Amino acid sequence: MEVTIRRARTTDVRAVRGLIDTYSRDGILLDKPTVMLFESVQEFWVAERDDNGTVVACGALHVMWEDLAEVRTLAVDESCRGHGVGHRLLEKLLETARWLGVRRIFCLTFEVPFFAKHGFVEIGEAQETDDGTTDPAAIATDVYEELLRSYDEGVAEFLDLERVKPNTLGNSRMLLHL
């Protein structure tokens, strides 16, 4: 199956919504209001089938800080799983992160083996170290304090804040150093 990986457009949001719905019904992805998808469409890339133009996968790269971003909402249509579409899409997100100058990529996932193939490692509970950083992602205390001001749930999940733990669905937090 041949697909083209490209930036998402507003006309793709309905297809992205459908992909998310499939995964959120199964408790794999958190549901997002459609308005949030439109607001963040510039963060998304999609995989489009070359033979019929159908969007069969999506993924987003959300920048959290100067050197930190999150891979979000990576979803592949069931009919396309096992064909490397998700891997190609993730590689495009990582390429985008490199281009932006982001050095660390975070994800919250059930798909630990998939992300591990790309170099992601599981991270544990955040703890402050003697040098003023927060393990395991090594965030300086001043940056941590700034990130606490964010209203973004993904930032709260990365920081492992108590208020979002019920929403993380038992996912693993993973980190990649580029």
Task: State where each predicted segment sits.
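A conserved beta-strand-loop-helix scaffold within acyl/acetyltransferase catalytic domains
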Residues: 31-45, 49-50, 57-76
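Short amphipathic alpha-helix that is part of the acyltransferase structural core
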Residues: 1-31, 48-49, 54, 150, ...
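Terminal substrate-recognition subdomain of acyl/acetyltransferases
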Residues: 98-99, 106, 110-178
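Conserved acetyl-CoA-binding loop-helix of GNAT-fold acetyltransferases
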Residues: 82-95, 107
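A generic "binding-loop/recognition-motif" signal
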Residues: 12, 67, 110-111
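Conserved glycine-rich acetyl-CoA-binding loop
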Residues: 54, 77-88, 100, 117
